[in-house]
Amino acid sequence: MHEKRRERGRTYRVGLILGFCLLIAVNGLFPVSCVYAEEEQTKIAYGENTPGQLYARSAVLMDADSGRILFAKNAETERPMASTTKIMTCILALERADPDESVSVSANAAAQPRVRLGTVEGQKFKLKDLLYSLMLESHNDTAVMLAEHLAGSVEQFADEMNQKARELGLSHTHFVTPNGLDGADDGGSHRTTAEELARIMRYCVMESPKRKEFLEITGVSSYQFSDLEQTQTYSCINHNAFLTMMEGAISGKTGFTGEAGYCYVGALKREKRTFIV
């Protein structure tokens, strides 16, 4: 009897993995690299009761409550992380600044490549509004605006991101940019692993003192705001398709660069359990 229950549970867990893989394959959303998580008591290696082809180059399953890794495929391989970087940018902004602070646009921020909010030097915005721009539309100029506001420069903010990574015990993660554009510095390339990216998301949704605010921002379908001078209104649409496609999805961030490929990290709740996706 107990063996049958365990087998049903295992089938459910593998089914969850298959479900995500099917969504990814059919919809073409994130075919290259993504992070999954779900509750289990024993670690499942890739190839053991898993789909014959898991198209992600790296993937993990994690129990979000305990942080236990339950499924892994190349989970410790260092790779660029594209715009999934912005979950760290967002949580640092929430933890270290007042949401009503005024943020100015520098020439450097305004010159960032697409995708961007489309700001001009000298514009001012409320910090809270920029966090929706960052997480829903993944605007690169917004990430630089926040980095410069919080730390004075992109380079100094990268140092603060790396300090936070060390506090979280992440030894294979290195930040160079606040927006996830590919880059390198004296510490090496902009990179993380599937496991460590999942741990960053776990911190954002489970452990941070600003987790409620993080979930509020990343869980909405759309948001509208204006600059402080009321000269222009901006509309943001959440591009995390899993919020509507997957029951229980509560947060997530997409990403893409030529070097990173397609990336995804997210969180969902099922039957009172929290998973990292």
For each feature predicted by the language model, list its residue ranges.
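Short active-site loop at a secondary-structure junction
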Residues: 71-92, 102-103, 125-133
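Short, well-structured active-site flanking segments
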Residues: 95-109, 208-219
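N-terminal Lys/Arg-rich, disordered targeting/topogenic segments
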Residues: 1-11
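Sec-dependent N-terminal signal peptides
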Residues: 10-25
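Beta-lactamase-like hydrolase cores
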Residues: 15-18, 29-84, 101, 158
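Penicillin-recognizing serine hydrolase domain
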Residues: 41-54, 153-276
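Solvent-exposed, polar/charged alpha-helical surfaces in well-ordered, non-transmembrane soluble domains
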Residues: 68, 87, 91, 95, ...
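Conserved catalytic neighborhood of penicillin-recognizing serine enzymes
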Residues: 112-145, 233-251
